[in-house]
Structure formats: C-alpha cells, structure tokens
C-alpha cells in the first residue's frame, strides 16, 4: 500500500522548494520540487497564498511565488516537527 502525503507534508514540500530557490520560485520549479500534478499544485498554491504563507508576483511577464515571513516561520516549525516525528519513526 502506498502512503499518501498529508496536506501539511505537501505544504512543507512546496515551501521547502521555494526556500531552496532563495525564497522565490516559478510554478514549474515548485511542481517538480514538490512532485505534484498541475491541478494539485494550483490548489495548494491558492491555499498557501490565501493563508499568507506565500505571495504571487509577476516579473518580466513571469509568475513567481515568494516565501513570506509567515511562511518562513511555518517552515521552521514544520522542520522541527518533522525531525521530532522521524525520531519516533512516525511519518507526517
């Protein structure tokens, strides 16, 4: 049986991908980095944007997503929580 990632784990993967791109990433980079389909990526980006974890911006006709301070705080807490759960063999 294949375990599916939780919504929180997907959020963490998206935010981590943006962070790895110096806090600013194109949707395609996020799509591959977080291993999501286009439809699921769109849904999660809208959710993260509406919650204030990321901001959508355009530059020279290209769309980027930028990590906000709230997103950085969430990612920091998520990373700590993930390490804690990993220590006990629990998958998020």
Please give the residue ranges for each predicted region.
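Basic, amphipathic "hinge/linker" alpha-helix immediately C-terminal to the N-terminal HTH DNA-binding motif
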Residues: 60-77
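Short alpha-helical segments that sit at the start of domains
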Residues: 1-15
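Short amphipathic alpha-helical interaction segments
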Residues: 35-50
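Short acidic, hydrophobic short linear motifs in intrinsically disordered regions
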Residues: 23-33
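A short, conserved structural fragment
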Residues: 49-59
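Short, locally clustered residues in the helix-turn-helix/winged-helix DNA-binding domain
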Residues: 15-22, 79
């Amino acid at each position: 049986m294949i375990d599916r990632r939780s919504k929180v784990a997907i959020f963490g993967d998206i935010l981590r991908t943006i962070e790895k791109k110096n806090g600013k990433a194109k949707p395609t980079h996020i799509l591959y980095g977080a291993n999501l389909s286009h439809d699921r990526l769109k849904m999660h980006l809208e959710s993260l944007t509406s919650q204030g974890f990321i901001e959508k911006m355009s530059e020279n006709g290209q769309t980027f997503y930028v990590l906000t301070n709230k997103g950085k705080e969430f990612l920091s807490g998520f990373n700590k929580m993930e390490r804690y759960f990993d220590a006990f063999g629990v998958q998020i």
